[in-house]
Each structure stands twice: as C-alpha cells, then as structure tokens.
Amino acid sequence: MRNFIVTGTDTEVGKTYVSCLIVKSLREAGINAAGFKPVACGDRQDARLLREAGPKDLTLDELNPVFLRNATCPYVAARLENTKVDEKVILRAYDALSAAHECVVVEGVGGWEVPIGPGRNFSDMAADFKLPVLLVIGNKLGAINHALLTLNAIKERGLECLGIVFNNVKDEWDTACVTNRSMVEEFSDAPILGELIHGQDYMDMDVLLERLH
C-alpha cells in the first residue's frame, strides 16, 4: 500500500480532520497506518490528534519532527527563532515511520505553496517525497478557484493527485457549497473520494483504498 500526502486549498480547511479520519479508518480495516506531520507551527495539536487516531506508542517528535512556536508560515517562524526547517531531519523521521507501518499519511502544513525556507515551498518538499497527493477542499465560497489552482500546481510538480475530499466546514450550506463539487468535477479530472458533512466522524474508504493499491 502506498503512502501519500494530504494537502489543502488553504489553512483551516480540515487537513488534520481528514487525515485523522483516514488513519483511523485504515486501522479499523486492519491496516497498520500512521499519521505524520513534518512541520507544525504555533502548537502541536495536529500531531496530538494524529497520534490519537494512530499508534499510541509513537512520540510527538516521531510524528512531528519539526515544531516552531510562532503561528505563521514555517519560513517566517523559523527566522523568528533563528533556526531553519531541517528537511534532512524530516526525511529521517519519515523513513523510520514508513519502515514500521503499511501506510503513512503525511499531513502538509498550510497550503500547497506555503514557504518553508529560502527558495523552498511545501510543494518542493512534496516533490522530494515523490508521493501521490490527496487534496482537501474547504467547501465554501471561493473554493473552486483555490481547488483548480492547487490541482494545476500538483500536476506541474509531476505528482499524481489521488483524489479530492470536500469538507463542509460549516453546518449551513449556501449556493456555493451546493454547486462547488459539480464545478470542480467539470473542470478537473481528479476523482472525488468523498464529501464530508460538518462534524462527520467516519469516511467511506472504498475508492481511496482502490487507488492506494
């Protein structure tokens, strides 16, 4: 089974929420899966949630090798702490997790092009990992543009898009929420893996599992 990256159209669109649902569902299906958060800024809550969804014996440092205290993009946060995002440390941690698990779900930081260092964006790191990418779309006004831009950027990196998960970030639905999915389907060839209502605590894994094998 292949490892993969979870990225989003923006920050706060539900990357951690979807990543945790996937890890939990894979493990319930008998697959030894773990989450991985290469970089966290501000706090480590995302890593804690991934640990709750996955193997409980992993430390936060194993799940999240780079933690920066300022809640901003990794490049700025690292500069404020007079340090840098050490991608070699990240790769070693990823390799260790990958060797011990059947599937590693790599949750990105911020959006696809967020800066992580001088001349380096998250998309550069993703390209180095050479993993397929799952895109989480926060289903709200403006999502179509953000989704198509991100899908095109993933293609430009030569990476496979595993598919799309629409995450309804609010209880209330407006016209955009109702029509975003059909527009993204019309203007892209990425498969829709699922659509989550606000607060949903499970995810149908059938389509994703087919694409991971």
From Swiss-Prot:
Kindly list the positions annotated as binding ATP: 12-17, 46, 107-110, 167-168
Cysteine pairs forming cystine bridges in this chain are: none
Its domain of life? Bacteria
Q: What is its EC number?
A: 6.3.3.3
Which cofactors, if any, are listed as required?
Mg(2+)
Q: What Pfam family does this protein match (any one)?
A: AAA_26
Localization per record? Cytoplasm
- Where is it predominantly found? cytoplasm
Functionally, this protein is described as follows:
Catalyzes a mechanistically unusual reaction, the ATP-dependent insertion of CO2 between the N7 and N8 nitrogen atoms of 7,8-diaminopelargonic acid (DAPA, also called 7,8-diammoniononanoate) to form a ureido ring.
Known partners and oligomeric status = Homodimer.
By what name is this protein known? ATP-dependent dethiobiotin synthetase BioD
Per the UniProt record, the lineage of the source organism begins with: Bacteria, Pseudomonadati, Verrucomicrobiota, Verrucomicrobiia, Verrucomicrobiales
What is the name of the gene encoding this protein? bioD
